[in-house]
């Protein structure tokens, strides 16, 4: 692992790796992120934000400053970099999101662990001809994102406290599910 550039190496099993990989993809590594940014995009749009601003406050915020801070300084640093008004918004979003996120993530983990998730994927592929899966990049948000990304100024990407609260709550919920597993 170290020869491949991994900074850490730990003992594991193939079963543990498969469970954590599939669970991770369904959770905060991919599936949950998509759900979070799509839901918050719709919320911000319903509150009057333009399409571009809603994209910046969701997808750009998560993939920009939120992820960068977590990668370099840890999850708590996201909260610590906010002023008191933004901390209150973060806290409200975190508290509202943690328990439902943990419940959904626990169900995902349980389905992966017992094999139901893999069976579901196989069954979905058998139905694909009649019920094709949609493309995630076909939504309004992702079309708007094409233009926003072209005009991106990295230093101007906002750290949205509500988006950060939901994202960090979901990340902590996933960590807690894995610690219990």
Can you say where each PLM-predicted feature lies in the sequence?
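Conserved anion/nucleotide-ligand pocket segment
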Residues: 1-7, 24-25
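NAD(P)-dependent Rossmann-like dehydrogenase/reductase catalytic/cofactor-binding core
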Residues: 2, 38, 46-181
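Catalytic alpha/beta core domains of metabolic enzymes, predominantly
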Residues: 14-28, 32, 153-166, 170
